[in-house]
Regions:
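A glycine-rich, hydrophobic loop/mini-helix early in the fold
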Residues: 46-100
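Cytoplasmic-side transmembrane-helix entry/capping segments in multi-pass membrane proteins
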Residues: 35-38, 63-73, 96-101, 119-130, ...
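N-terminal topogenic module of multi-pass integral membrane proteins
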Residues: 1-61
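C-terminal ends of transmembrane helices
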Residues: 20-25, 49-62, 107-117, 160-172, ...
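C-terminal transmembrane helix-loop-helix hairpin of multi-pass membrane proteins
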Residues: 1-13, 30-39, 125-126, 133-210
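Alpha-helical transmembrane segments and their membrane-interface exit regions
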Residues: 43-48, 103-111, 130-133, 152-162
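Interfacial loop-to-helix junctions that mark the boundaries of transmembrane helices
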Residues: 1, 27-36, 66-71, 91-95, ...
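Membrane-interface helix caps and helix-loop-helix hairpins in membrane proteins
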Residues: 91-92, 113-120, 138-143
Length: 210
């Protein structure tokens, strides 16, 4: 039920951005063709069906508990990073700005992530999206779209997933012993945070929020 609600909420948010003109404006500013957009979303959707197991995490406290298997979902984690490389060809924010804002988003996302015995790591998007959007507009008003995307994706990946991996060992009662980074596919926080950060930044820019 929660998954369907998240899907509907995501569609509603994108519909709002479309109504405000933010989605169209982002596509135009990044000079993304309809063909490139279709290919990108196709890769993300197909990648969501593919998971690659990396290694296992043994519980340090309960040796009798089966290890938690850790993997990556290609659509939810790898494809957003490929998008990042593509976007860098459209705009080129300064690398130091990327590092600074990524560190900020990581610091915001980390405490807003909780461990769930059923689903593993649950990340709340609001902090990543808003901090990346506002930070990008302040640091680089020219290349704010790609800066917001980069910081949101990397900050969510690091603060929401990677830094919480040690805590997975403590979830001895998890019903699902396999956890995928980016496991939500196109509905995963890593994938959505970057897209929403760009559109939020564009909305703030149009409103002359800063």
């Amino acid at each position: 039920m929660a998954r369907y609600f998240n899907a509907l909420a995501t569609l509603a948010i994108f519909a709002i951005f479309l109504k405000l003109g933010s989605l169209t404006s982002v596509i135009n500013k990044l000079q993304i063709s309809q063909q490139e957009l279709a290919v990108g979303m196709g890769l993300a959707t197909l990648g969501s069906l593919l998971g690659l197991q990396l290694f296992s995490l043994e519980s340090t406290e309960h040796r009798h508990i089966p290890p938690i298997k850790l993997g990556v979902n290609l659509g939810g984690s790898v494809v957003p990073l490929l998008f990042l490389l593509f976007f860098f060809n459209q705009q080129s924010p300064q690398i130091q700005h990327v590092f600074i804002l990524t560190a900020l988003v990581t610091a915001v996302v980390y405490p807003m992530t909780r461990m769930d015995r059923q689903r593993g790591m649950v990340i709340y998007l609001f902090g990543a999206v808003v901090s990346a959007a506002l930070g990008a507009l302040m640091l680089d008003p020219k290349n704010y779209l790609v800066l917001a995307y980069s910081a949101a994706v990397l900050g969510t990946l690091i603060g929401g997933d990677l830094l919480h991996l040690p805590q997975l060992k403590k979830l001895t009662e998890m019903s699902n012993r396999t956890v995928f980074i980016g496991g939500g596919g196109v509905l995963d926080a890593i994938f959505l945070s970057g897209l929403m950060a760009m559109m939020t930044a564009e909305t703030f820019q149009q409103m002359q929020f800063l």
